[in-house]
């Protein structure tokens, strides 16, 4: 091997195992192709060649590099307006607000709760006039409810993952039992992209793709689709053992292609929780639900560096951690770190204390 080292990329989405201890390295996969690339050279050169192989990230919208605000648990339009006003009235830069699942009707994807979020289009427009873009969360699970149009379409057109018996896979997530689009099928990706058109016409500036490992609420077993779930896999066919790691990547691809089709004049912004090699072609990433502790901050730094070394350069975290109540010092240090990352967002769980900067005292502000 060359003196400068090398980068090894195994092009296999199946579950893998690696043992890098000692003098030898061992890598194995539970199925899939045995196809790999060895890229020699110093780290920066090898990484550049890897990114050219898996795909370069596109130029982002300029506003995305500014400060973003989000919070799970903003139950009404008025709560969101109050938070945005709090930043603007204090002269604190705010470029985007992210709406979590609270804006949906019963957590049904592609819906808006008109009672709690009336005239969402007007809200998006009002924020835009103040220089604040709106980003909406989307989950892949489609509520398995008779009469719900996306579910009925999915059944009629064969868009959902199925068991070997032919039965649609259903699993518990936010709206209750849900079915899961098979993003390994080009037909499904096109359908999903069409579903974004209405939001884009409203002026929505980006989408936050969550729960797309895909994740399920499971009391036991793996919190995802069963290994036997069937996927199209671009016409080759196969089960979830090959499709699992591709699911988030292909949901991002479907969203990107829909964005480009229905808002061709703009640069898409997508944020994803899950992905695979090449996801940087479509989406940014954040580190997910990290605990609000010093160890959580250290783990976040490791994750951000690891993502960057995997070609996913546009990354960030939930400032202060997602779950818990950071001390003023931890909050401030996390903020300082996050200001140097491409994705700069304050976000937290609904059970945590409010943590807008002015809530933690004058010294922090």
Task: For the regions a language model picked out, list residue spans one by one.
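Catalytic-domain carbohydrate-binding cleft regions of carbohydrate-active enzymes
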Residues: 1-365
